[in-house]
Design a protein with these regions (language model features):
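Catalytic machinery of carbohydrate-active enzymes
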Residues: 1-219
Length: 219
């Protein structure tokens, strides 16, 4: 068992060749807002002793070196960090811990990026069910509400609250977005909408399933 300090560097510039790999116009790895959103979640993890913004603290392992490994820059699979630390762990076990949300519980929770939508999939049948909640960006919510008119929206104050809502859900549905990353770490029941152009994200362990076609999504 290890207890580590983690320092997050905000506004670090992306290499010129990969600018916009997350969103058009992105020029940094993590914005200050993104760092502020994720720190409360990371501070809840028992294996992290200190979590704060980087300010020239001593660093033993620079996790940004992951981006210098000779492989596709867009690969977001967490296991590739094993090759930096030399520590291999069982990714079928939970590696994120949070409490249940005090108020929002037993919802079907969705976070779906508009950039990674599967063109073979629609969510219209979900309108037949109740207690469907979207967390994430409002523009993404409005996009999905065209298919699910009774879809509700909640604006989380940070990723810790998002994780608490996901943990308290009936199950989670998402595509390649930070919401699925959280659900994957929690190992709660989850469905992953595979992205045809880059299907590299998939569940490991627990009640996790991915789908590529509509018939499998609905059944």
């Amino acid at each position: 068992n290890h207890v580590c300090n983690l320092y997050l560097q905000n506004k670090k510039l992306l290499p010129t060749k990969v600018i916009g790999y997350k969103h058009p116009g992105d020029k940094v790895y993590m914005s200050e807002k993104m760092v502020d959103m994720v720190i409360p979640l990371l501070k809840e993890q028992k294996y992290l002793n200190i979590v704060e913004k980087f300010n020239n603290q001593t660093v033993d392992v620079d996790l940004d070196l992951f981006r210098k490994i000779p492989m596709n820059f867009n690969l977001d699979e967490v296991r590739w960090y094993f090759h930096l630390t030399g520590v291999h762990t069982d990714l079928s076990n939970p590696y994120i811990e949070v409490k249940n949300h005090q108020k929002i519980k037993d919802k079907v929770v969705i976070m779906r990026s508009t950039r990674r939508k599967n063109i073979f999939i629609n969510y219209k049948f979900i309108n037949n069910y109740k207690d469907i909640l979207f967390i994430g960006l409002e523009e993404e919510y409005l996009d999905l509400k065209k298919e699910i008119p009774n879809l509700e929206f909640y604006d989380c104050k940070n990723f810790l609250e998002a994780a608490e809502i996901i943990k308290s859900s009936k199950f989670f549905i998402g595509n390649s977005s930070f919401g699925f990353t959280i659900a994957e770490g929690l190992k709660i029941p989850r469905l992953m909408e595979s992205f045809p152009e880059f299907p590299v994200i998939y569940p490991n362990g627990g009640l996790g399933y991915d789908f590529y076609f509509q018939v499998h999504f609905e059944h």
